[in-house]
Amino acid sequence: MDFDHLTTFLEISKLGSFSRAGQKLFRSQPAVSAQIRQLEQEYGQKLFDRVGKTVKLTAAGEALIVYANRLLNLKEESLRAVSDLSSSPRGTLNIGANEATCLYVLPDLFAAYHRQFPAVQISIYRNFSRKVIEKIEDGTVDVGIVTLPVKSPSLKIHSIFRDRLMLMVSASNPLSRAKGVTLSEIADQPQILPKTGYTRQLFDKLFRPYRAKLRVTMELASVGMIKRFVAAGLGVSIISESFAKDEVRSGEAKLVPITDVQLTRELGLVYRRDRTLPRAAAAFVTLLRQQHFPADGAHVASKR
């Protein structure tokens, strides 16, 4: 098995052309054709069909793509694992998280990480937890911090942070003086909601009995925008306690406990079970284990 042949095969499958793949890989078209012929001889199957000026994968080619990607990824992992043994963490930490986690959780963690490993560059993939998990599973992202629960037997999952959800109101809202608030009282207020995500799913479930009297004034994709509009008095929102510290500290807003139900948001560190983490990512996991993980180690979801 020649890894170079597999690289050529994957480029042709992406570009739909032997000549364009050759140009990208700085190889002549005859050399590209020879590599594919050798692969086809090895597997005993035709891998491409010509369709006009382009080429398309055969059924055998489609089957090979999955394994070709896996083999090349394993090659890179093995090279990284061996070279990392002789050096302190370098390279890039590829991490995924949603917007709120990037803004309100990661800065302190990254500051501690950077003090220990200044040579590591940090690359953040920002998206919803579901998308972050997809990127971890396909190997694009090394580790992710996502909202739990996560159900995936292919992932190692550690609980690292639990935050209380509270009602955020403007300082001028009469509820700002309340010691607590019920779901029914919240339902009487104009609502500013996230468009999607864990908190929105939780809200929709909790307030289903109050749907008739709910007034949703705004739906926003950004936690930062939600906080600004709540502070301006345009509505209320259920939000993680740690996300609203600045607004509470400045006096622009208040956080009111919800009395008839205990609401929390739990964050977890996730990464693939079957993959050797790059040294930079492994160092990040170790740092979080020291700072955040409970004494019993991995979250129960990882023990399946």
Task: Indicate residue ranges for each PLM-predicted region.
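Beta-alpha-beta core module
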Residues: 152-159, 163-164, 178-179, 185, ...
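Central regulatory/effector-binding core of bacterial HTH transcription factors
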Residues: 90-153, 211-213, 220
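Secondary-structure junction motif
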Residues: 189-210, 277-286, 292-301
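Short helix-boundary/capping micro-motifs
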Residues: 12-28
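A short LG(V/I)-centered, amphipathic sequence patch enriched
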Residues: 18, 40-57, 62
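Short beta-strand-centered segments that line the small-molecule binding cleft or hinge
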Residues: 70, 85, 108-112, 129-165, ...
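Hydrophobic hinge/microswitch elements
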Residues: 128-133, 137-141, 146-147, 198-256
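A late-sequence structural motif
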Residues: 105, 254-298
